[in-house]
Amino acid sequence: MLDKSLYELLEQNHAYASVLHWCGIDAFDYLDETLGDVCRIKNISTYNVAQALSELESNGTYSFAKLQRMSPAEMCNYLMQTHHHYSQRMLPVIEHHIQQTAIQHHHQYPQLLLLAKIFDSFKHDFLAHIQYENQVVFTYIKKLEKFTIQFSNVLWLALKDFSMGDFIMKHHQDDDDMFNIRKLLNNYEVSKEDHLAYKVLMHELKSFESDLKAHSLIEEDMLIPRAIKLEEKLTQRAHELIRLN
């Protein structure tokens, strides 16, 4: 791997570009150099870079069965970790590659100039969405789980300003956030003749959208139904206490 040029590595696996970026290497500035030479130029550990690239093949996503065994609170923590990955790693890399490719190849791909504007708007809305989930929705679900185990009237009152119905309505409104991007880029279609930078960018956008869909399914098919059951259980408990009083 260290003896291959960055061009060869990116042709081999487009996802390597983002990993190299996280390691401090802007791959498109060194396409003709070998990975080993670039690491020496940048004074970066060849072992760490090679390790990061090899770990890409065995990503750290949880299996469906493992997610099923998680409690709602554990699932919230897992989703918050993926939110962090999106905001701190995936979005910055994609945004950088959009800007870089648009500057260098906008004559061949004029749609990239519009993409830069659309993606900036998408990023703003998306970051607000995951912040809302982290701070409001997941906090609420964790309280639901806690109060189901140890119920009190005081704790129940703390949940009265929000409900899962509020989140479901907002979540459905935010579905398919990347529709305009996908439409602009013709479903991320590429050809053999396309520039490597463009092919890498399309791969990153397509992979990101695929990851978002999987993330959304975890929320909609696993987390939300469980949270609704907790909410219904607590509501029933509260109504029983009211009747007794």
Set out the residue ranges of the language-model regions.
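Small-residue-biased structural context
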Residues: 1-245
